[in-house]
Amino acid sequence: AGIENMIVTGYTDVDHMWNMVKLEGKWYHIDVGWDKPSAALSERYPDMVLYQYFLSEDSIMENNLIISNMLCDPPVADSSDMYYFNVENKYAETYDQALEIIEQSCRRCIDSGEKYFMIKLDSSNLYLQTTSDLIKPDSEGVTDIDRIVRSLNFKGQISYIDYYKAYRIIIFVLE
């Protein structure tokens, strides 16, 4: 029993092609080409995958391209049920939720030896608040990221890359 799928085309500045798959009766986009990080990140973290376009819905694809399939009429993909950031509990709608996800994900990385994780934020405002407030010292000079590091007894360093600002994704690196 195979998975129903199709090739879809569209364009930004150039023509582009990716896949759609049908899982549990709903269609999703998968674009492994656009989920590949930049050359600099790939060199440092060769196994990194971004997951922005993994089991995503139309609205995410349409942020960056125009779907104009010449091969077939693509079905509607309007479910986020299997979207990576939802399934992995890496999607935050508030700053407090983002802090909780960051702390839990740091703990998982420390326990497993993984070097990085990603979270996606609900809005551009939350993205800006998170990237700002994480490193903003309070009246005692302590930042939220410092609090997380201390609470986990982590002896290394946690940094973040706001590499995917347009998509509201932050990559955290533990070293």
What are these regions (language model features)?
Residues E24, D47, Q52-E175:
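N-terminal accessory/pre-domain segments preceding catalytic cores
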Residues A1-L55:
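Hydrophobic/aromatic-rich core segments of domains that either
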